[in-house]
Structure formats: structure tokens, C-alpha cells
Amino acid sequence: MSVDEKPGSPMYVYESTVHCANILLGLNDQRKKDILCDVTLIVERKEFRAHRAVLAACSEYFWQALVGQTKDDLVVSLPEEVTARGFGPLLQFAYTAKLLLSRENIREVIRCAEFLRMHNLEDSCFSFLQTQLLNREDGLFVCRKDSACQRPQEDHGNSAGEEEEEEETMDSETARMACATDQMLPDPISFEATAIPVAEKEEALLPESEVPTDTKENSEKGALTQYPRYKKYQLACTKNVYSAPSHGTSGFASTFSEDSPGNSLKPGLPMGQIKSEPPSEETEEESITLCLSGDETDIKDRPGDVEMDRKQPSPAPTPSTPTGAACLDRSRSVSSPSCLRSLFGITKGVESTGLPSTSQQPLVRSSACPFNKGISQGDLKTDYTPLAGNYGQPHVGQKDVSNFAMGSPLRGPGPETLCKQEGELDRRSVIFSASACDQPNTPVHSYSAVSNLDKDLSEPVPKSLWVGAGQSLPSSQAYSHSGLMADHLPGRIRPNTSCPVPIKVCPRSPPLETRTRTSSSCSSYSYAEDGSGGSPCSLPLCEFSSSPCSQGARFLATEHQEPGLMGDGMYNQVRPQIKCEQSYGTNSSDESGSFSEADSESCPVQDRGQEVKLPFPVDQITDLPRNDFQMMIKMHKLTSEQLEFIHDIRRRSKNRIAAQRCRKRKLDCIQNLECEIRKLVCEKEKLLSERNHLKACMGELLDNFSCLSQEVCRDIQSPEQIQALHRYCPVLIPMDLPGASVNPPPVGVEQSLAPSPCAVGGSVPCCLEPGAAPPGLPWVPSNTSENCTSGRRLEGSDPGTFSERGPPLEARSQSVTVDFCQEMTEKCTTDEQPRKDYA
């Protein structure tokens, strides 16, 4: 965190699951090509090139030998205890985390690892692997007690009865650990500690030279004499082991083990031999063991015993009750501790607190089988219910007995699958190999792993199982809601569409076959491809059933569902809501999901054609041009069914494209019309503004004309001038002047009144004030004064009728035109110049 960053701000941490593996791959490639190697190791006259940092990180011996060396090209000669045949696999393990062992080199590898103090190996697997590789050859456990992780072995020269019991124990151990021979390292390893009494726990803390021979023999004989008691205790624990919760320290949960009556229940190793684990949250999260939640009732009891054993590494030989077999679960993470760092000897059972909608589900687990590593961080707090029993026998809770198909053997991933997992949380495959040593973790909210789902998923990609590709989901558990299985055809499944964690597809799994669902009317197609996000398979997939008993579509949802929705009740409520119309989503002609004419064909639910397998992706059918498409068709030998399907797909694609183009043309037309409408609206607003401006100008002109007319009328003194005025501007009529309109005015008067503004026209009258008229002559305004804004009418006088020389009366209507205004302006401008001369 930076200095200026607020501590309360949210922090986002990205943790890569492949970064460590990629670094190891890069370092190993550099070592093979002798790039950046800075140390040469000489072992039995054989040179090994390596990096100092890698050696110092893996071995305490190299840490002490290489730290402080400043030479550029350092040469280190290892002592005689280190052999080339034992050091080669260890060097390869340092760079690849994989150790290759055989019966010929296991002893030398063990000696070299002990000498070089590579505790990640000696603490985890040497005892187990040595037992597996040597017990078939020698018939007994051959392992010296010269390291902290080695277990005391039984003497080969015991009595015949004891030897039979020993062989029986070995046979059961070998049968239960059969899968571990296939996965040597660094796969998860599960084994059980041999039955050792407390006296041998003392010897485990002492060097081999300090342990007397008679003490070893007595302790080994004591172990054999105590075998029946341990056997009885095992049978008792098998019945009552699941009544108490199990706890782990430092975030490492104790694991389950399953013991048959022929196997002895062996206590864990002393806590003094177990390396302390740093109490960090990262280490707790990196470990892939199952952390069991629940009511921790006796957490104060057993950890107390552990602390007492740690304080007293060499206790007196007092009778101690073994706490149960401990199954080691090794984490593959680089910074994870060794197997023995998880808690030993405190496992008695698990108390599951099941959810309300689910019953207690069994967890069938073999002692020699490691747990699956695909556990997310949230799963570390999930409760589990163990179930003791054989691997091939199904065990189901009482509540769900009627909903499960019985008798399906469990199958787990083989060595190749385990090597590819690398503990990643995005495991997206539910295909398991035919190994009988491992199985996926079964949480309490999933159905039993012995249902028909595991039987179907054990086959390589069944035809009825479709898994949506290209989607990464937050968990790796396989959930089987196999109720009402009788309604389906054999090999068909109906998973719950509302399961909390849906099924995922593994990106490293083999590519799925190109699978397609088609009906007789060719109305619905779903084509599954590996990683084809743009293909129709990116939508939820529907499979129509041909069985008359099942009317709904089998739906495999690849969406992330709410964690709280689970159980049979939710499954039964959601299942009837699935409609067959959802299959049209893959053929929808546009992005909004509407139907086109080509996609609205009828599709009966009962009619379902066979699968159509194509030798090329479905995207090429729709994307390729016509010539390339024809060439591709000619290159492959296709059946009539395939050709019909291909042409139908291409036809639908062309129809969809044509419909999209048609909609695009319509949208373009609509946009063009909208643009035209906007232009017309703008032009209308512009014209209206011009009209208002012209009206304002015309009003100003009328005001000026009225004022000028009033001034002219005030200057009139004689009747001749009045007659001349009304001749050119008939505005006012004197009532008592009968001959005014007959006698023409003098020529001088005409010339003097010709440039008057009244000659512009009679459309705008000029109203004279009463005082301006000659005495005895009343003046009456004519009809032309109606449109004068500044004119005044004389009260009680009748209007006269005069002819007008101006524009017609229609021009003075409410809708004043532009032409009239221009005419008025031109006349006013033309007559104004002579008036200036006259003035």
C-alpha cells in the first residue's frame, strides 16, 4: 500500500493461479539451455548447471553453501553421500515440482534429500512411496528411522502369526493406496500412519544411533500385540466417528479417512515432528484442505493435547488413545506447506449442519485418495458429512433415497487429469476418467455423487450433456439434481436450472465435439463449439425431448445463479417454467430477440431430429462468401442430412441479414424524413421572424406618414388647396363644400401639393384636429382611416366615401404581404426626394 493511500479505501488483489507454474517452466527452460545459470554442481564427476536462487530456495544445504559466494561462475563439488542417480531427480523436482521415482533410485533419492535437507520431500511422501515401491518386493515395510518423517518399521523376523497379521495389514494398505502408485508426485498424496505406540513416538524424536535395538524390537512387538485392540477401537470409531466436529489449526482442516475392518486405526505422528506453520491468511487460503465450519465444541480439548505433546517431545510410555487416522492432503501451491504441516491425530469426525432444503449428503472418500483441489475460498467454510463405506456402494440420505438412482460407481480423475488441474478454481469440466481413487468434492448442498450424473459424466462427453463453452463460472463443483430421472431417456439428465453453482467446462479439457440439435422442421439449432463466443451456442442451450413423458425442454443453464436458491423445492418450482420458445433465441433475426418471418415456423416439442456433426465450425457457414462456401462444401464428403442442415443454416443467416438490411433502410428513410422536417421547421421559424420584423417596420412607416399628413392639413388655408389635397390625397371631406369635388384646383396649388406625402396613397388617412380646419368647415374622416394606427375620428360625424388611388382594400387585410410593404417602401423613398427640394 502506498504512503499517500487511505487505509480505508477498498483494495483489489489479483492472484494468478498459473504464475508460479509459468515461472518454474521458464527457469527449467533456462536451465536446459544453460541461460543465466550461475553455479555448476559436480556429482560423481558429472556436472549439473543450475541457478543459485532456485537451489537455495529448495535446500537448506545449498542455502548455507551458496549464500555469501560472490564468484560469477561458482563450481560446487558435492560430497560422496550425494549420488548422480539420486541428485538428478531432486534437481528436476526443484525446477518442475515433479519427482520421478522407481524401485532402483528411491533409496538414493531419499538419502540425497535428507543430506541436502529438502524437507518438502522428506516430510511428505518418502515413507509412503517407499512403502508402495518396496512392500510388494519384500513383503514388509522397509524404512529406516533416520529422519523425522520416517515411520518405525516392523521386524522381519517375527513369529508366523504376527507375520500373517502384518501381511494382512500390508495387503489392506496396498489395496487402499492403489491409486497413489499412479500419481507419484507432486499430486496430492493420502496415506495413513502405521500403528505405532507411544514408546515408538519417543524413538521418532531420537536419532537412530541413540535408539537401542531391544527398544525397537519391543516396540514393534508391542505394536503387533496391540493390534486387536486397535482393530476394536477402529470399529467403534467407525460407528461414532461422525458425531463430533473436526477441527484444524492454522486453517488446515483435518481430513477424512475410510477404514475397512481389516485395517488398523493408526495414530498420528507426534507434534514435535510436525513443522510449525506460519499463521498467515495466505497460507491458510492456499492450502487445499477442507476447512470444516460448525459449532466447535471441543476445540479447547484436542489443541491442548497437541500443545502438551509439543512441549514434551519425549513423554513417558503412558497409554494414549489414538485420535483417528489422518489423511494427508498436499497442496500444489508453491508457497504451501508440506503434507505433515497439516494437523495429525485430532480427527474424529464431522458434524454437518445441513441447509433447510437439503438433507445430509454422504461424502464417500477413500483413505488413499486425495481430495479434489478445485475448492474455492468460499468452499472452505462449507460443512460436509462423511460416510464410511466401500467405494462401489452408494450411500444416500434418508430424505433423498427416492430421488436418486442407485448403484453407480464413483469415478475420479486419473493421473493425467490431476497433473493438469494445478489447483485452479476455474475448472470447467465435469468429465472424469475411470480411476477409482479420487472424486470431486461434494458439498452439503449438492446431491450424492453416486447418482446418475456421475455415471453419465464418467463417459467422454455424452451426447445428451451439453455444456456451454466460453463461460468461466466461480466454482468447480458438479451438482446433480437427478430427481424424476425416470422421465428421461437412458443417459439423459435434467439438471436444476437454479443450482447455486452451475456446471463448468474445463478450458484444458479436450475440445468438445461439434454438436447440434435439430428438429424435423429445422426451426431450432444449437451448435456447441469450444470457445466460439460468437456462435449461437453462447446463448442458453435447450434440448427438446423425444419422450412423450417429458413435455418441457431439458435446459442446461450456464448463468450464475443466486447462492440461496437450491434444493428440490426450488428445482420443482423452476422446471415447469422452462418454455420451448427459449430455443428460438439462437435463431432470432435481430439483437432484441424478436422473431422474423423465417424464424416463426412451427416446431413441435416431441419432434427432435438426430444430431448433425459437421467437419467445420458453423461460423464458416454464415461468414464465408459464396465461392468459398461452395469450395468448402466440395472439399468434404457430406451426407444429405448435413447438406440440408448447412443450407438451412445459411438460408436463415441470409434471411436474417436481409431483414437487418431492410430495417436499416427503413431507419435511414425515417432519419431522412426527420431531417427534412427539422429543416422545414427552421425555415418556418425564420419566415415568422421576418414577418414580425416587417410588421414592426410597417408600423413605423404608418406613424411617420400620419404625422406628415397632419402637418400638411394644418397648412391648408383656402378651399382651392383643400380640393387639390383631396384630389391627390382624398383623406378629409368638408361637409359644407358642395363644389369641392367639381372645381379643379389651380395649377400652382397642384404643383405645391403634388410632392405631398398624401400622394403616396389613400390607404392611410391623416386625421386633422378640429382647430386646424378653416372656420365653418367641419372635417369628417373617410373610410380609409380604419387602418391608421394614429388617426382619430371626430365624434358624431358620418364617414364619407371617396375613391382611392392606392392599393386595393384586400392589401390592407390582416395578412399583410411582403410585396405590399415593399411597394409602400419604394413609394415613400421615391416621393421623399422631391419633397426635400420643395422644402
UniProtKB/Swiss-Prot annotation:
Post-translational changes noted in the entry: The reversible disulfide bond may provide a mechanism to regulate the activity in oxidative stress responses. Phosphorylation at Ser-520 downstream of the PI-3K pathway promotes nuclear export.
Residue ranges of domain BTB in the record: 37-103
Subcellular location: Cytoplasm; Nucleus
Stretches the record annotates as Basic motif: 650-666
UniProt KW keywords: Activator, Cytoplasm, Disulfide bond, DNA-binding, Isopeptide bond, Nucleus, Phosphoprotein, Repressor, Transcription, Transcription regulation, Ubl conjugation
Signal peptide coordinates: none
Tissue spec: Detected in brain and spleen.
Cross-referenced SMART domains: BRLZ (SM00338), BTB (SM00225)
Keyword Ubl conjugation tagged: yes
GO cellular component, one term: nucleoplasm
Biased composition (Low complexity): 321-331
InterPro entries, per the entry: BTB/POZ_dom, bZIP, bZIP_BACH, bZIP_Maf, bZIP_sf, SKP1/BTB/POZ_sf, TF_DNA-bd_sf, ZnFinger_BTB_dom_contain
UniProt region (Disordered), positions on chain: 150-170, 247-331, 582-609, 778-813
Renumbered ranges of motif Nuclear export signal: 819-839
Assembly description: Homodimer; disulfide-linked. Heterodimer of BACH2 and Maf-related transcription factors.
Protein name: Transcription regulator protein BACH2
Organism of this sequence: Mus musculus (Mouse)
Gene name in the database record: Bach2
